[in-house]
């Protein structure tokens, strides 16, 4: 950095100061050293001020939004005939040439005041002279040059022609190898950094195109209707995935080779690759599945992941694999340990909020362990796409392959892989084998056993969580409540089963009578309610065989309707009904009369041999919870059957309360932002892309594709990639490049560049046409893949036409200049506000 800055200072002093000062003074270098000290002081001031600038915000938000506003204003000003065009409002300083110079003078004066060394600030004449030089000899000529469409067209044409020449040179220099291994060998054997850079670019373009293709909506599978086309589609998707994976490995190898040869370190921040052991790369490529299913390989992969502080991913994969094959009694403890290790203490495994809630439900025994298999699959994809390619080009992989060649543990790999694979399948088959209940008669007993198993699981889970290093108080409280609920459900089921047995054993001996009646509110309306006492006819019966149930008049009417479908003669029996007259209240007379009618109805039912065996009657008289009494007797036999009664119940009726708890629970917000704002920094860029290329309906698809593309190509979220990219373009390495480019442009080969010749209108027009043609011929493949060929073409033409307006270019330059200078020197804001106020 210091060297290129010193070159710029030396050349400037030689050509702009010494050229006239040398004839006036016999100074032996005193002025040079004085000015050099001031120059380094100014550089120090600039560096200090730049350190306080949020470069990511300026580049990704402020500049992009300024460009978006510029294109929106241009679009409105060039509206079609059927629309009303809106005037394009220029920057305040472009009112006339005098105001333009005043604006630049204001900027120059503040810059000089902010950056000049403290010993020189007091000199008004020095500040005035330097500000005037900065205005007339630097800023004004730069603005005139950069806003000139002919200069822009020349730069575009020159750059595009240079890229064409380079591309043609590299196309002649290589052809793709016949196999993937040969392609990797081609990369490792080449020592031309420019060639490798071009090859890397081609690989990235190929990744982009493959990612775009793979993101098209796939045919949905329909159960039992898997067509040949669907199978082909799935096969294509799998092959595309493997192709992207191979390209990613090749890209990593290319970057590694470039780094070895002294080129830029593309992957220095992300893959943790060591410079040690940079020997020839092994040509053997282990498949990801082989690495994960072999403990020896997986251990080395885990060591690599530990180097980049991502060991938890492999650890979770191993824990989930162990959980699949664990004994039933071990599951609560293992689930608790996984929850504590990966989601409480470290939170290194990021999951969506819905999955996190499923984990908590599994922890308390409300769900199975399937959620860990889902997360394991996601973790496996992350390992495959982000870290597996980097591992293949790391020194650890090199050492692993060297050990493989020495020990040849192929037999061990096969046996261990088969053992692990068969163990997983056996576990799955064992789970699937328990899914059905073949004997309906044992349904109630099995339900009770399931409840007891669930209760035991929750008690074990509670014990594990209470003994954990960081017990979750919310989950402990929830578990205790659920244990109480299940205990109550067990008691209720046991009592219901016992009561049902009593009913069956004493069919024909039960009696029911209404002991009292009252008026209740139901949906804002009055409704009579009756208390029905059920007891055995025997005198001195057991106390537990007597109970009382409250029943509304509407429930009596529903019972009458159901039984009438089986016994048509019941239709002749009249039940009390409420008056339909408005404001008619229910009085004691109605309650007494209806009570007598309903008593007679009940006695009639319990004395009829066909009716007292009815399931509907038992459900009506049973005090068991409502979910035990939803029975449809239409078309069923009239004899009562306990097994058929229980079989009609929904399989999951005992877990309905737990599902409600799950719906309302919000035990943790962990993972809420995993997918929510992963592209917030890119939002202005998406808007700018949408405006330039007029995406309309394609906007969401392009957005998703860009996110997926960045994830696959760079192995990170788009937010992180944007931050890293901005950090890279503002790094010291790139600043050196910018200053070197400036130096070489002004002083090619160390000599001051000659002034540019004035070009004719015909020459400018020819350059414009050629530049536009070259632009359209060189639209990036990435862009065409993302937005389509037509949209890409229209967008490029829109950008090119926008650059052909001198005043519009000046307007944009002054907007950006104001934005950047006020970030560098916030003191400038007050002066510019005064300037704009004077324009009104």
UniProtKB/Swiss-Prot annotation:
Residues 404-437 are annotated as: Disordered. Keywords: Coiled coil, Endosome, Membrane, Phosphoprotein, Protein transport, Transport. GO terms for cellular component: endosome; endosome membrane. Residues 287-401 form the RGS domain. It comes from Mus musculus (Mouse). PANTHER family: SORTING NEXIN, SORTING NEXIN-25. Residues 1-164 form the PXA domain. Residues 446-494 form a coiled coil. GO terms for molecular function: phosphatidylinositol binding; type I transforming growth factor beta receptor binding. The gene is Snx25. It is a peripheral membrane protein. SMART domains: PX, PXA, RGS. This is Sorting nexin-25. Residues 508-628 form the PX domain. The modification Phosphoserine is found at residue 665. GO terms for biological process: negative regulation of transforming growth factor beta receptor signaling pathway; protein transport; receptor catabolic process. Its main location: membrane. Belongs to the sorting nexin family. Disulfide bonds: none annotated. May be involved in several stages of intracellular trafficking. It is found in: Endosome membrane.
């Amino acid at each position: 950095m210091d060297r290129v800055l010193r070159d710029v200072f030396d050349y400037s002093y030689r050509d702009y100061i010494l050229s006239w000062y040398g004839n006036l003074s016999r100074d032996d270098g005193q002025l040079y050293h004085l000015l050099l000290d001031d120059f380094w002081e100014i550089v120090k001031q600039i560096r200090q001020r730049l350190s306080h600038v949020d470069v990511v915000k300026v580049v990704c938000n402020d500049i992009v939004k300024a460009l978006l506003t510029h294109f929106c204003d241009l679009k409105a000003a060039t509206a079609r005939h059927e629309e009303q065009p809106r005037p394009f409002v220029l920057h305040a300083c472009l009112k006339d040439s005098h105001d333009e110079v005043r604006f630049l003078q204001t900027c120059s004066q503040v810059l000089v005041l902010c950056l000049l060394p403290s010993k020189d600030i007091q000199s008004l004449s020095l500040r005035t002279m330097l500000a005037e030089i900065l205005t007339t000899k630097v800023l004004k000529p730069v603005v005139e040059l950069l806003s000139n469409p002919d200069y822009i067209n020349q730069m575009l044409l020159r750059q595009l022609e240079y890229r064409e020449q380079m591309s043609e040179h590299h196309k002649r220099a290589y052809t793709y190898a016949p196999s993937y291994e040969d392609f990797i060998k081609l990369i490792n054997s080449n020592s031309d950094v420019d060639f490798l850079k071009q090859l890397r670019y081609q690989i990235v373009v190929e990744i982009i195109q493959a990612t775009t293709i793979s993101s098209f909506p796939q045919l949905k599978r329909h159960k039992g209707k898997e067509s040949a086309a669907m199978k082909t589609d799935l096969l294509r998707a799998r092959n595309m995935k493997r192709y992207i994976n191979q390209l990613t490995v090749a890209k990593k190898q290319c970057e590694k080779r470039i780094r070895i040869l002294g080129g830029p370190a593309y992957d220095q921040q992300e893959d943790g690759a060591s410079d040690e052991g940079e020997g020839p790369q092994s040509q053997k490529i282990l498949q990801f599945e082989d690495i994960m299913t072999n403990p020896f390989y997986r251990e080395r992969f885990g060591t690599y992941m530990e180097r980049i502080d991502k060991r938890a991913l492999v650890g979770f994969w191993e824990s989930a694999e162990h959980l699949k094959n664990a004994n039933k009694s071990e599951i609560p403890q293992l689930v608790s340990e996984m929850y504590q290790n990966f989601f409480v203490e470290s939170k290194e495994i990021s999951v969506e909020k819905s999955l996190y809630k499923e984990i908590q439900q599994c922890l308390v025994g409300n769900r199975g362990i399937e959620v860990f298999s889902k997360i394991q699959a996601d973790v496996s994809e992350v390992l495959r796409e982000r870290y597996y390619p980097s591992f293949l080009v790391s020194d650890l992989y090199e050492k692993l392959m060297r050990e493989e060649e020495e020990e040849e543990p192929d037999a061990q790999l096969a046996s261990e892989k088969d053992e692990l694979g068969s163990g997983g399948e056996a576990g799955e088959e064992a789970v699937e084998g328990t899914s059905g209940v073949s004997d309906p008669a044992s349904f109630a007993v099995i339900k009770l056993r399931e409840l007891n198993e669930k209760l035991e699981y929750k008690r074990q889970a509670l014990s594990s969580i209470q003994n954990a290093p960081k017990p979750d108080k919310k989950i402990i409280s929830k578990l205790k409540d659920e244990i109480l609920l299940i205990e109550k459900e067990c008691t209720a089921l046991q009592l219901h089963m016992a009561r049902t047995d009593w009913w069956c054993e004493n069919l024909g001996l039960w009696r029911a009578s209404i002991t009292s009646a009252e008026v209740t509110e139901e949906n804002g309306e009055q409704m009579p309610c009756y208390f029905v006492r059920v007891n055995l006819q025997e005198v001195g019966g057991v106390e537990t065989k007597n109970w009382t149930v409250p029943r509304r008049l509407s429930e009596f009417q529903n019972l009458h309707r159901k039984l009438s479908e089986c016994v048509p003669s019941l239709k002749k029996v009249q039940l009390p009904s409420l008056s339909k007259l408005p404001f008619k209240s229910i009085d004691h007379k109605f309650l007494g009369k209806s009570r007598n009618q309903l008593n007679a109805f009940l006695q009639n039912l319990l004395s009829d041999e066909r009716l007292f065996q009815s399931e509907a009657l038992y459900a009506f008289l049973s005090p068991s919870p409502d979910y035990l009494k939803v029975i449809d007797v239409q078309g069923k036999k009239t004899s009562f059957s306990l097994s058929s009664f229980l079989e009609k119940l929904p399989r999951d009726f005992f877990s309905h309360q737990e599902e409600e708890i799950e719906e309302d629970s919000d035990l943790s917000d962990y993972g809420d932002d995993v997918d929510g704002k992963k592209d917030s920094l890119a939002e202005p860029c998406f808007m700018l892309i949408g405006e330039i290329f007029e995406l309309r309906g394609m906007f969401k698809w392009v957005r998703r594709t860009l996110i997926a593309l960045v994830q696959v190509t760079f192995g990170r979220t788009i937010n992180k990639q944007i931050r890293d990219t901005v950090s890279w373009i503002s790094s010291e390495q790139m600043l050196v490049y910018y200053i070197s480019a400036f130096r070489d442009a002004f002083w090619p080969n160390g000599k001051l560049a000659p002034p540019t010749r004035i070009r004719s209108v015909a020459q400018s027009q020819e350059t414009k046409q050629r530049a536009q043609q070259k632009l359209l011929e060189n639209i990036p493949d990435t862009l065409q893949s993302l937005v389509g060929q037509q949209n890409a073409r229209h967008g490029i033409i829109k950008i090119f036409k926008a650059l052909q307006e001198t005043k519009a270019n000046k307007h944009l330059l002054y907007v950006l200049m104001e934005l950047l200078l006020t970030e560098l020197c916030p003191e400038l804001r007050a002066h510019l506000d005064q300037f704009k106020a004077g324009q009104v």
